[in-house]
Amino acid sequence: MEVKIFRVKGTFEKGGKKFRFTKEYRALKPEDVRELVFSDIGSKHRVKRAKIFIESIEEIEPVEAENLVVKRLSLELA
């Protein structure tokens, strides 16, 4: 199986306010990315999974990645 890059867009609620986010992850499948988002945002912002709303998970090419760590890892290993 090949590791792919995914871009995730969504929102989360904290303290009655909504915050938008865009994250990029390396994973095998979209289901893995979904769990990474819940884990990452939940731990950093102390938000429950029910307050995290994922709008889209899209697969992108390594050159499209904005996160430099994800981009370099993907280009070096390709």
From Swiss-Prot:
What interactions and quaternary structure are annotated?
Part of the 50S ribosomal subunit. Binds 23S rRNA.
Annotated source species: Thermococcus sibiricus (strain DSM 12597 / MM 739)
Q: Which GO terms describe its cellular component?
A: ribonucleoprotein complex; ribosome
| Signal peptide from the UniProt entry | none
Q: Which Gene3D superfamilies match?
A: 3.10.20.10
Judging by the UniProt lineage, the source's domain of life is: Archaea
The alphabetized list of GO BP terms reads: translation
Name recorded for this polypeptide:
Large ribosomal subunit protein eL20
- Identify the keywords attached in UniProt to this record, alphabetized: Ribonucleoprotein, Ribosomal protein, RNA-binding, rRNA-binding
Q: Which GO terms describe its molecular function?
A: large ribosomal subunit rRNA binding; structural constituent of ribosome
Sequence similarity? Belongs to the eukaryotic ribosomal protein eL20 family.
What Pfam family is a match, any one? Ribosomal_L18A
Q: Cross-referenced InterPro entries, in alphabetical order?
A: Ribosomal_eL20, Ribosomal_eL20_dom
User: Do the record's keywords include Transport?
Assistant: no
